[in-house]
């Protein structure tokens, strides 16, 4: 979706991202073109970025993912990115949503992606963090007052319709429902909302299909932009 907006000459002044969205956000804010971000991931597998946990806090650890981020970003800290990025994670110790605007990028993005049970929580400066989507899966409000207009990009339906009865599958599906529920009020705060349908056949972990997912998002955004153009309206739904 970012690629379509990019081609339409629409560039953000600030970006808010959570979970997988925070990954794309920091790479884009670091100066990479959307298709370059796709290239980074399409040759990787889920196993390249994770390893089995030897503790009891989660099934997998994200040390390899943190190293991957650190190696492929040109800067270390959020405040050094070319475009400001707000990364949302969930403070597990205090039961609240936290919006990171500074500090180590890789650690904070890993925290935002640490789905409970599947991944070990991330410890940052003595506090444990898990996936930002637990409390805020569509973090619009964290930047709403700083923006004249906001475009929301939603790809959260990345979950298969069919699922097996394993403890992991059940947990992931339950999290998905919870994440969807807490995003409803945030979506209403967008001036333009673009959502990608047809992603129900993909898993969050199918990195080999990242190009297919990219194209679905690209086409969805282009369809919205084309429809607005045909109606002779701007992306803010005002007359041209």
Q: What is each stretch, according to the model?
A:
Residues 1-18, 26-240:
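Patatin-like phospholipase
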């Amino acid at each position: 979706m970012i690629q379509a907006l990019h081609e339409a000459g629409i560039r953000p002044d600030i970006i808010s991202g959570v979970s997988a969205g925070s990954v794309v956000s920091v790479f884009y804010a670091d100066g990479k073109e959307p298709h370059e971000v796709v290239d980074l991931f399409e040759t990787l597998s889920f196993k390249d970025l994770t390893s089995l946990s030897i503790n009891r806090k989660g099934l997998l650890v994200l040390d390899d993912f943190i190293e991957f981020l650190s190696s492929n970003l040109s800067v270390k800290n959020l405040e050094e990115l070319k475009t400001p990025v707000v990364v949302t994670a969930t403070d597990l110790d205090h039961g609240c949503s936290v919006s990171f605007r500074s500090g180590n990028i890789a650690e904070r993005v890993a925290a935002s992606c640490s789905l409970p049970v599947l991944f070990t929580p991330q410890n940052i400066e003595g506090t444990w963090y898990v996936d930002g989507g637990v409390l805020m899966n569509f973090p619009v409000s964290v930047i709403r007052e700083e923006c004249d207009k906001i475009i929301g990009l939603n790809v959260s339906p990345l979950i298969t319709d069919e699922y097996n009865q394993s403890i992991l599958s059940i947990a992931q599906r339950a999290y998905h429902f919870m994440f969807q529920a807490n995003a409803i009020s945030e979506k209403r705060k967008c001036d333009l909302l673009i959502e990608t349908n047809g992603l129900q056949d993909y898993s969050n972990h199918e990195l080999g299909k990242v190009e297919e997912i990219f194209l679905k998002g690209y086409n969805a955004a282009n369809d919205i932009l084309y429809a607005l153009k045909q109606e002779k309206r701007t992306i803010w739904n005002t007359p041209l």
